[in-house]
Amino acid sequence: ALSYLTAPLAVFFAGYLRAPLAVAGLAVLAFAWWYAVCKTPQVKQVGQEEQGITLSVPKLVLLFALMLLWGYLGGQTGFFYQNSDWGYRNAIYRDLITNSWPVYYPQKDTALVYYIGHWLVPAALTKPVYALFGLDAAWMFARMALWGWTALGTYLVALNLLVYLRADTGKKQGIGLLFLIFFSGMDILGALYS
């Protein structure tokens, strides 16, 4: 999970900063990641058992498939319903793929200023596809990359939630996942109703 959170920052440093700052930022980020993963002692209170749950491989695969379905139904691929604001976000994502970084619009003398972290890894993976095969192929790949990246993130959130809840039975795991999924916006119901 820490690597998932660190990756967009690493891509930002590499793609948006000048070389000396990028190298320094990446070095600090790599050290912080290494320290957090390898050197930070696990903090436990006296008498507290170590938290952990066991999930079989089929359950892990099913959970990832559920996260893929959730992302698909949420509009990640563009093949299913998307709220009206997806048009703006798709344009920003496309600009991250088709323009050099940092994204600058000379006709308006302005830069792309937005919270772009979630798109940076899929956009970086898509840039070579755009360079080799053009926009149509790149956009298809980009939608799949964003879908996979989002599914991975929600998968890690779901796993961490299940550990936090100590969901050690199928019933507890199901309730935890229902809570996670239905805690979010339910705007699709409005779209289906209209």
PLM regions: where:
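Long, contiguous, compositionally biased segments that the model treats as domain-scale units
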Residues: 56-59, 72, 76
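Hydrophobic alpha-helical membrane-interfacial segments at the cytosolic entry of transmembrane helices
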Residues: 58-66, 174-181
